[in-house]
């Protein structure tokens, strides 16, 4: 009974582009029919800036099997202002991403950013997401 159906509730973080083929091979071997790539731009890594590009690439390579959830860009740990976050979420939506992996609510990230999730910085972005039903 437990292994009769394929596992579909899975997300993957991929940090180095050289691991793309290995990631796809793992997805195939595990029998995932759908999976989600969650970009992570707040990592302390030279690959942080390329996370959203890698996320979009995996969505294209996987031909509909991979959902792409982008990640907001920050200036260090400073949360962008409301207009910048609005521009970012609109771009993700228009570029074909399936949603946002909003890392701001994770305890460690939130501690570094020192900003509550109900701060005005997020208002326009949350309004857009709610109005368009763009997943966060």
Which stretches of residues belong to each language-model region?
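An N-terminally biased module of ancient metal coordination in phosphate/nucleic-acid-related enzymes
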Residues: 1-65
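Active-site gating/metal-coordination segments in enzymes
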Residues: 49-136
């Amino acid at each position: 009974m437990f292994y009769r159906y394929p596992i579909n509730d899975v997300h993957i973080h991929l940090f180095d582009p050289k691991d793309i083929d290995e990631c796809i091979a793992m997805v195939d071997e595990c029998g995932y029919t759908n999976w989600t790539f969650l970009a992570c731009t707040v990592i302390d890594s030279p690959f942080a800036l390329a996370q959203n590009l890698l996320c979009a690439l995996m969505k294209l390579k996987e031909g509909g099997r991979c959902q792409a959830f982008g990640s907001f860009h920050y200036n260090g740990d400073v949360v962008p202002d409301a207009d910048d976050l609005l521009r970012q979420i609109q771009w993700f939506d228009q570029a074909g991403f399936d949603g946002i992996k909003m890392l701001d609510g994770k305890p460690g990230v939130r501690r570094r950013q020192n900003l509550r999730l109900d701060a005005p910085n997020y208002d326009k972005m949350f309004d857009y997401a709610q109005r368009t039903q763009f997943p966060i």
